[in-house]
Amino acid sequence: MADLSAEEFCEATDLYLDDKWSYAPLIAAVLCRPEGERYEEKKALGRAERLRRMPMGIVLRLYATLEKTHRRMKEKYPLCYASPLSDGRHGDTGREATRWSDLMMWAGHHLPGETQRVKRMNAYDFMALVHSRIKMTAYR
């Protein structure tokens, strides 16, 4: 997980939160690629078709790793888990939960060139960026 891009991390997390069992092959396709291969959505969709019969043990280990990564990220970057898009409120606010891909767009200021840079960032660097941006907006 240390080499994940922000895009891979956010895409896998959004799919996991939406319906981790239905999206298991796609989540595996996003996170498990040949070394050095960049993430491409079309390739991931094709790979997901081939992973449909993947053993449940692999899925469970993959999910345990993703959950462990989130626990570490939450310890290091807690502000990322209180959404800046909902003013950092927790609980039932009547608003739809912020998606990780929305945070990625927010971190890139919703500008195409900046968003592409953010997508290619390492996931840990992305979390540090989001955490610092939340801090900056909180002190304005």
Model-derived features: where do they sit?
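An amphipathic, hydrophobic-aromatic interaction surface with interspersed Lys/Arg
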Residues: 1-140
